[in-house]
Swiss-Prot record:
It catalyses: apo-[ACP] + CoA = holo-[ACP] + adenosine 3',5'-bisphosphate + H(+). One of its GO terms (molecular function) is holo-[acyl-carrier-protein] synthase activity. It comes from Alkaliphilus metalliredigens (strain QYMF). Keywords: Cytoplasm, Fatty acid biosynthesis, Fatty acid metabolism, Lipid biosynthesis, Lipid metabolism, Magnesium, Metal-binding, Transferase. The gene is acpS. One of its GO terms (biological process) is fatty acid biosynthetic process. This is Holo-[acyl-carrier-protein] synthase.
């Protein structure tokens, strides 16, 4: 049963500007494992924007605002085939448990200008 749906779209250029302005941007919003993934992919802003959009989509699927958790409470990882999956921590995990959410499916894509992600909580 679907318990929540979230979608987010972001301009890749917005993330590129944030990376230029604040060198600690990635450290503040993304986990160590997520940052390792960015390095492996060459640190392209489109990849970073996709993961950011995924985090936003998950927040919406959980039905809460980000004020109830930290960005690092939502981790976007990839399996051995490269498929993204969500791992929740701390408050995000507690919120999911309280709503009887067992899994969050995620899809991420981007064009030249935008990154988009959709999350479905079950």
């Amino acid at each position: 049963m679907i318990k929540g749906i979230g979608i987010d779209i972001i301009e890749i250029e917005r993330i590129a500007r944030a990376l230029e302005k604040n060198p600690r941007f990635k450290e503040r919003l993304f986990t160590l494992e997520e940052n390792r993934g960015f390095i492996e992919k060459g640190g392209h802003p489109a990849s970073i924007a996709g993961v950011f959009a995924a985090k936003e989509a998950v927040v919406k699927a959980l039905g809460t605002g980000i004020s109830n958790m930290k960005w690092k409470d939502i981790e976007v990882l990839k399996d051995s085939a490269g498929k993204p999956y969500i791992k929740l921590h701390n408050n995000a995990l507690e919120i999911a448990y309280s709503k009887n959410i067992n899994e969050i499916f995620i899809s991420i894509s981007h064009s030249k200008e935008n990154a988009v992600a959709q999350a479905i909580a079950t």
